[in-house]
Amino acid sequence: MSKTSVIYPGTFDPITNGHVDLVTRASRMFDEVVVAIAIGHHKNPLFSLEERVALAQSSLGHLSNVEFVGFDGLLVNFFKEQKATAVLRGLRAVSDFEYEFQLANMNRQLDPHFEAVFLTPSEQYSFISSTLIREIARLKGDVTKFVPQAVVEAFERKHQQGW
């Protein structure tokens, strides 16, 4: 039987406990999980690619079958390069499903071998998004129950730098 691998793409700006939950669960379902951290030029990320990779590694590095890779360009091309089995996407709400369904179908048009696997987050993470976390942190709110400790510390450093 061949090894199964799944790509979990995102900007992870920052990684949240919801992301950690999905990767942890995927690591039990697939032989290999590739956390593919998009450069995200169009999103103007708060954290650099290097910072986001380091935060993901510190949050998930204890999982031996998880690797962390920065990438740029079309996901479907990265999928082919990695020879992945599938792409993992999290679904928090019906609105996520509509967008992800459209995206998966477009990617399948570009590559008929493209497969998407959808997981819903554990209930306590269903409302968390990186966008909300950044906004709470920007306004100096407490995000400790939503993100790994390394992210809390990274936000503290951003505040010390005048963010």
Curated annotation (Swiss-Prot):
It is found in: Cytoplasm. Its cofactor is Mg(2+). The record marks H19 as: Transition state stabilizer. It catalyses: (R)-4'-phosphopantetheine + ATP + H(+) = 3'-dephospho-CoA + diphosphate. Its main location: cytoplasm. The keyword Nucleotide-binding applies. Pfam families: CTP_transf_like. Keywords: ATP-binding, Coenzyme A biosynthesis, Cytoplasm, Magnesium, Nucleotide-binding, Nucleotidyltransferase, Transferase. NCBIfam families: coaD_prev_kdtB, cyt_tran_rel. Homohexamer. This is Phosphopantetheine adenylyltransferase.
